[in-house]
Design a protein with these regions (language model features):
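Conserved residues at the C-terminal ends of beta-strands
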Residues: 1, 80, 154
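Conserved, mostly hydrophobic/aromatic
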Residues: 25, 77, 151
Length: 186
């Protein structure tokens, strides 16, 4: 891809200078990640799950600290992008390796939040609300002990059904799991 940490710092500073808080979206991939593509970075290809969760945690913490040290007002951090089918090369939310990646990313955010005494919300992000799988995803995360603040959805009206369905899917998450909800990609 053509975005890296230094470019994120530059863009984050511009947004902060304009009075905005910033959402950082870690794809944990060398290129764009979406429901069809969740490839781990090449450097992580031969790692065990223990090594991969450690590098996710370190990478997330180091990147956030770099952004904050540069003066970027980080308000939310997304652990993965459209992660319906996995994250960082791990497949399926019922897979313990997949939820371990989510847990490592969220724990990193919470550690930086605590160390910096700064509220930073941990976000998980999915797509395809029209398939009505969101409660399944939220249950898998809850069962695995993944602690996050915001359940986010992509929403493209052409592909993702009605706004009423999106609202119903997200409201069910709030009612059952007490999570904030957002549409993060429209």
């Amino acid at each position: 891809g053509n975005n890296d940490l230094l470019k994120a710092v530059d863009m984050g500073k511009l947004a902060t200078d304009a009075g905005m808080r910033v959402l950082i979206d870690f794809h944990y991939s060398d290129f764009w990640a979406d429901p069809a593509k969740q490839k781990a970075p090449k450097a992580w290809a031969d790692m065990t799950i223990a090594e991969k969760t450690a590098v996710v945690k370190d990478y997330t913490m180091n990147s956030l600290n770099t952004l904050l040290d540069a003066g970027v007002d980080v308000g939310m951090v997304q652990v993965g992008n459209e992660t319906n089918n996995g994250i960082a090369g791990e497949s399926g939310l019922e897979n313990a390796n997949t939820t371990a990646i989510f847990r490592a990313g969220c724990e990193a955010i919470q550690q930086v939040e605590q160390d910096r005494n700064k509220e930073i919300k941990a976000v998980v992000h999915f797509a395809n609300p029209e398939k009505q799988n969101y409660m399944t995803y939220a249950k898998a995360l809850a069962d695995a002990g993944v602690e996050y603040d915001v359940f986010a959805s992509s929403y493209y009206p052409y592909w993702h059904g009605t706004l009423d369905n999106l609202k119903n899917q997200l409201n069910a998450i709030t009612e059952k799991y007490g999570k904030e909800v957002r549409s993060c990609t429209c």
